[in-house]
């Protein structure tokens, strides 16, 4: 290992979009990492981020307390990155965001781990009409009750190579002349996955104040319309941005959400009704990305590095300056 560190970190959901970046950062810092996932056989790609034997995928189901306890056994630090956007079978919002988070927090407390980091989401609100936002907030409460010194991070939309948001609209822009625009005036503060991973790593290694909720937003605050204009620009397309009323979007989502992998659900439409930016309260309490000493990376720098794949001629497409 490059900076060998005897401490062991268990990361739940380490094989996902954010998790792979977190594993890479912590592995480079020399930590031993236990990757707790439902399918270890599908998590082999994360092992390449470290030296031989440094990263170990193990089976864990956060709905099963026994498997969670095995995963955190002898760990010094625990990180929970598990979350879902749509429910599927037993993987409901309540089961994952509340019960699963609670199980991990309790197991971490009983294992006497030094630090526990829980990834939530900006907009978490137990009074929200959105089940996603509501269960995220209730999950935070469950975590803090079980592990009072936990650090909770609430990021806005996360972008980067492999993200869901820009890649989804990029793919749509490549095949359709029209891009549907739900909540065109709703504000977002997209944050780069690398910045989120750094914040998680710093929180996990005790570099910021514990027992606190941090709101993470990026360098730019833009409306949905502005974000889709970026998609059109980066893909070199001439798509028409079509405003879609919330009532119509919910009607369409009612039918789409019965599909195995729905493109849109009613709950997602509800989330789009509210701004997703760092609150004045968090700024006043110094509970933002700046608290980590991290300067937010602009979309201007990152989007061109992966959105080129949706251009007619890929990287060889002539771009306007």
Task: Identify the meaning behind each predicted range.
Residues 2-31:
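N-terminal Rossmann NAD(P)H-binding glycine-rich loop of SDR-like oxidoreductase domains
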Residues 5-8, 32, 84-146, 150-155:
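Conserved Rossmann-fold NAD(P)-dependent oxidoreductase catalytic core, especially the SDR/UDP-sugar
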Residues 31-41:
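Conserved glycine-rich Rossmann-like NAD(P)H-binding loop of the short-chain dehydrogenase/reductase
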Residues 40-103, 107-110, 122-126:
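NAD(P)H-binding glycine-rich loop region in Rossmannoid oxidoreductase-like domains
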Residues 103, 164-165, 183-205, 212-215:
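Substrate-positioning beta->alpha
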Residues 128-130, 151-170, 222:
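Flexible, glycine-rich beta-alpha linker
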Residues 187-194, 216-233, 243-254, 295-298:
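Substrate-binding strand-loop-helix patch
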Residues 247-321:
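A hydrophobic C-terminal alpha-helical subdomain
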């Amino acid at each position: 290992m490059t900076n060998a560190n005897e401490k062991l970190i268990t990361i739940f959901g380490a094989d996902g979009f954010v998790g792979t970046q977190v594993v890479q950062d912590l592995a480079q810092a020399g930590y031993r990492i236990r990757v707790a996932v439902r399918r270890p056989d599908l998590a082999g790609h994360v092992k390449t981020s470290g030296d031989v034997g440094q990263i170990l995928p193990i089976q864990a189901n956060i709905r099963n307390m026994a498997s969670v306890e095995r995963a955190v056994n002898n760990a010094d630090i625990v990180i929970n990155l598990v979350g879902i956007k749509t429910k599927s079978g037993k993987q409901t919002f309540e089961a994952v965001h509340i019960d699963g988070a609670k199980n991990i927090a309790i197991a971490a407390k009983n294992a006497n781990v030094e630090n526990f980091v829980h990834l939530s989401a900006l907009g978490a609100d137990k009074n929200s009409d959105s089940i996603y936002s509501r269960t995220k907030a209730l999950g935070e409460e469950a975590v803090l009750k079980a592990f009072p010194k936990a650090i909770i991070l609430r990021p806005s939309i996360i972008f980067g190579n492999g993200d869901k948001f820009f890649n989804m609209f990029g793919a749509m822009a490549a095949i359709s002349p029209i891009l549907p625009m739900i909540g065109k005036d709703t504000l977002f503060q997209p944050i780069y996955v690398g910045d989120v991973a750094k914040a998680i790593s710093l929180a996990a290694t005790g570099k910021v104040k514990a027992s606190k909720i941090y709101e993470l937003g990026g360098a730019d605050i833009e409306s949905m319309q502005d974000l889709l204009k970026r998609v059109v620009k980066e893909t070199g397309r001439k798509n028409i941005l079509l405003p879609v009323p919330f009532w119509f979007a919910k009607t369409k989502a009612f039918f789409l959400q019965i599909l195995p992998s729905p493109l849109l659900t009613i709950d997602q439409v509800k989330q789009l009704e509210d701004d997703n930016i760092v609150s004045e309260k968090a700024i006043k309490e110094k509970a933002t990305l700046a608290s980590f000493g991290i300067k937010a990376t602009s979309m201007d720098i990152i989007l061109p590095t992966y959105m080129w794949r949706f251009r007619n001629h890929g990287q060889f497409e002539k771009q306007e300056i």
